[in-house]
């Protein structure tokens, strides 16, 4: 079976073609970084308009890359949520229209399920059950995964997501959009322990996260110190260390509570080198294993949507024409396969 995947939940237009026997046949991605750079963040209306311009040309490019056409497809998968409602509507409208015109099923995919399953695109894939840390600009959550669609949310952010805190703190440091990766790069030049920020909610039981207070602490420190480059780097280092320590502590707690020794990290922040190193050390100490997608599949992409859509397609879980986009969509409400 072969499926087209469409991702348009935020500021990346991702298109992919996936074959359940041959694997990923095509992957096309357009980032809107230049569109939003002058505004310091994503402008929803501009994001939607750019998806309108880019989606169909990228689909044509994917067909050319894969050496196939619509007649070779068995379904079309699209991101139905969560995300920016206007951006979601673009991908949903195009995906459902193409599926209807080509007389093949449409499959509505949960964006975070796409991230959660992204490591399945690699050679070394995790077996069920595993613990998943989903950490991105819009979400931070810990999920126990017993199988596809069998998700138990163990904890999630009660305010800002980790990626959002990265981006907002980067903006306070005067870094250009997208700030998260730039803050991580700046942190490499920072001096350890010059500044020390709190590790939010680690002194309380449970697996929920909170990063707004950490962002506030960074804001106060920035305001009260000189704005020379070394000071900025030291603050970036302290901030990143605090976020990573918090995530690692929560992962260790989740693994200990469940007795599971397989950990998946996915989402944009999972590309952070220091986070990967820390979690690899943790899993080595626990005689377990950590899994994550290649860097290009950490951020939003069509490949993860195509893969997740294929699993739903094979299970006969299709989207009806009245299927709505869901800007808010709990991952633990999904149907099990």
From Swiss-Prot:
<dbReference type="GO" id="GO:0005737">
    <property type="term" value="C:cytoplasm"/>
</dbReference>
<feature type="binding site">
    <location>
        <begin position="134"/>
        <end position="138"/>
    </location>
    <ligand>
        <name>substrate</name>
    </ligand>
</feature>
<feature type="binding site">
    <location>
        <position position="167"/>
    </location>
    <ligand>
        <name>substrate</name>
    </ligand>
</feature>
<dbReference type="GO" id="GO:0002949">
    <property type="term" value="P:tRNA threonylcarbamoyladenosine modification"/>
</dbReference>
<keyword id="KW-0479">Metal-binding</keyword>
<dbReference type="GO" id="GO:0061711">
    <property type="term" value="F:N(6)-L-threonylcarbamoyladenine synthase activity"/>
</dbReference>
<keyword id="KW-0808">Transferase</keyword>
<comment type="similarity">
    <text>Belongs to the KAE1 / TsaD family.</text>
</comment>
<keyword id="KW-0963">Cytoplasm</keyword>
<feature type="binding site">
    <location>
        <position position="300"/>
    </location>
    <ligand>
        <name>Fe cation</name>
    </ligand>
</feature>
<dbReference type="InterPro" id="IPR017860">
    <property type="entry name" value="Peptidase_M22_CS"/>
</dbReference>
<keyword id="KW-0819">tRNA processing</keyword>
<feature type="binding site">
    <location>
        <position position="272"/>
    </location>
    <ligand>
        <name>substrate</name>
    </ligand>
</feature>
<dbReference type="InterPro" id="IPR043129">
    <property type="entry name" value="ATPase_NBD"/>
</dbReference>
<protein>
    <recommendedName>
        <fullName>tRNA N6-adenosine threonylcarbamoyltransferase</fullName>
        <ecNumber>2.3.1.234</ecNumber>
    </recommendedName>
</protein>
<dbReference type="InterPro" id="IPR000905">
    <property type="entry name" value="Gcp-like_dom"/>
</dbReference>
<feature type="binding site">
    <location>
        <position position="111"/>
    </location>
    <ligand>
        <name>Fe cation</name>
    </ligand>
</feature>
<feature type="binding site">
    <location>
        <position position="180"/>
    </location>
    <ligand>
        <name>substrate</name>
    </ligand>
</feature>
<feature type="binding site">
    <location>
        <position position="115"/>
    </location>
    <ligand>
        <name>Fe cation</name>
    </ligand>
</feature>
<dbReference type="GO" id="GO:0005506">
    <property type="term" value="F:iron ion binding"/>
</dbReference>
<comment type="function">
    <text>Required for the formation of a threonylcarbamoyl group on adenosine at position 37 (t(6)A37) in tRNAs that read codons beginning with adenine. Is involved in the transfer of the threonylcarbamoyl moiety of threonylcarbamoyl-AMP (TC-AMP) to the N6 group of A37, together with TsaE and TsaB. TsaD likely plays a direct catalytic role in this reaction.</text>
</comment>
<keyword id="KW-0012">Acyltransferase</keyword>
<dbReference type="InterPro" id="IPR022450">
    <property type="entry name" value="TsaD"/>
</dbReference>
<keyword id="KW-0408">Iron</keyword>
<dbReference type="Pfam" id="PF00814">
    <property type="entry name" value="TsaD"/>
</dbReference>
<dbReference type="InterPro" id="IPR017861">
    <property type="entry name" value="KAE1/TsaD"/>
</dbReference>
């Amino acid at each position: 079976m072969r499926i087209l995947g469409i991702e348009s939940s935020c500021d990346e237009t991702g298109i992919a073609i996936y074959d359940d026997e041959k694997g990923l046949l095509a992957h096309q991605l357009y980032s809107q970084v230049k569109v939003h750079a002058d505004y310091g963040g994503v402008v929803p209306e501009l994001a939607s308009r750019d998806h309108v311009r880019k989606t169909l040309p990228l689909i044509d490019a994917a067909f050319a890359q894969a050496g196939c056409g619509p007649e070779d497809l068995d379904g079309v998968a699209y991101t139905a949520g969560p995300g920016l409602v206007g951006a979601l509507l673009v991908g949903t409208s195009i995906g459902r229209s193409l599926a209807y015109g080509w007389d093949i099923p449409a499959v509505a995919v949960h964006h975070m399920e796409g991230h959660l399953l992204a490591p399945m695109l690699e050679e070394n894939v995790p077996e069920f059950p595993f613990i998943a840390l989903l950490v991105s600009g819009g979400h931070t959550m810990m999920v126990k995964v017993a199988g596809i669609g069998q998700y138990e949310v163990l904890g999630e952010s009660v305010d800002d997501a980790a990626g959002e805190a990265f981006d907002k703190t980067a903006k306070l440091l005067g870094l250009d959009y997208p700030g998260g990766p730039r803050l991580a790069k700046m942190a490499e030049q920072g001096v350890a322990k010059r500044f020390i920020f709190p590790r939010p909610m680690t002194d309380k039981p449970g697996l929920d996260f909170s990063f707004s207070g950490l962002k506030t602490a960074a804001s106060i420190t920035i305001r009260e110190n000189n704005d020379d480059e070394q000071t900025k780097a030291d603050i970036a280092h302290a901030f990143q260390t605090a976020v990573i320590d918090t995530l690692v502590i929560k992962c260790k707690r989740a693994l200990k509570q469940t007795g599971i020794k397989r950990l998946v990290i996915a989402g944009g922040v999972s590309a952070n080198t220091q986070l990967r190193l820390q979690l690899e050390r943790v899993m080595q100490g626990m005689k377990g294993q950590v899994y994550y997608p290649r860097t290009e599949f950490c951020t939003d992409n069509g490949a993860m949507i195509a893969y997740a859509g294929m699993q739903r397609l094979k299970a006969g879980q299709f989207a009806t024409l009245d299927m709505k986009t869901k800007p808010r969509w709990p991952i633990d409400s999904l149907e099990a396969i």
